[in-house]
Swiss-Prot record:
Segments traversing the membrane: none
Annotated protein name in UniProt: Small ribosomal subunit protein uS2c
Organism, as annotated: Vitis vinifera
Subcellular location field: Plastid, Chloroplast
GO BP of this protein: translation
Cystine residue pairs: none
InterPro entries listed in its UniProt record: Ribosomal_uS2, Ribosomal_uS2_bac/mit/plastid, Ribosomal_uS2_CS, Ribosomal_uS2_flav_dom_sf
Gene name of the encoded protein: rps2
Keyword Cytoplasm among UniProt keywords: no
GO molecular function terms noted in the UniProt entry: structural constituent of ribosome
Family in the record: Belongs to the universal ribosomal protein uS2 family.
A GO cellular component entry from the record: chloroplast
Pfam families, A to Z: Ribosomal_S2
Amino acid sequence: MTRRYWNINLEEMMEAGVHFGHGTRKWNPRMAPYISAKRKGIHITNLTRTARFLSEACDLVFDAASRGKQFLIVGTKNKAADSVARAAIKARCHYVNKKWLGGMSTNWSTTETRLHKFRDLRTEQKTGRLNRLPKRDAAMLKRQLSHLQTYLGGIKYMTGLPDIVIIVDQQEEYTALRECITLGIPTICLIDTNCDPDLADISIPANDDAIASIRLILNKLVFAICEGRSSYIRNP
């Protein structure tokens, strides 16, 4: 795996609140190696460990992107949704930021059928065909289109399972993580002090509740993906 310098700055992470964990009563003992202190009733994450695993994750996504691999970013809670969409669009990744529909990856054939329906309805809307239908039929199909846009809009160009999945908040996206594990899809996961660090292929200990923390971690990963894609374009 390529080793590169990703400008991961501990002071920058502190300013973003990456080090703030959950309350000391709400933690997973398996996170002990990633916790450096307790302060005012909350655990403090060891940012040196965060920097190490974030750097490893950046190396992984850079190498994958340089080989033309596809990524999916998953983060559906309100604090993560906008950052996930922005990061994914910037790096030309697929994303899910509203709700992970059970079986989205393990039952890919059903997801693929929904995506075909979604694309067909988008085409009908763009060509004006929907507006030429009876009002009742048009209204029903427009509702379907709106529903599909909400839940599948971020994966509308996906033609197969992703090569790597990046997950924001292990507990919130546990179903997505379990599906990836079942299928053997490599995962990178932000883990707070209440998570299990042994589930994902690379777990990045970080505050998964603060927007600034989520955005910082995603920005580093996205930069690495973009760098990798540039390398792939230059060396096809």
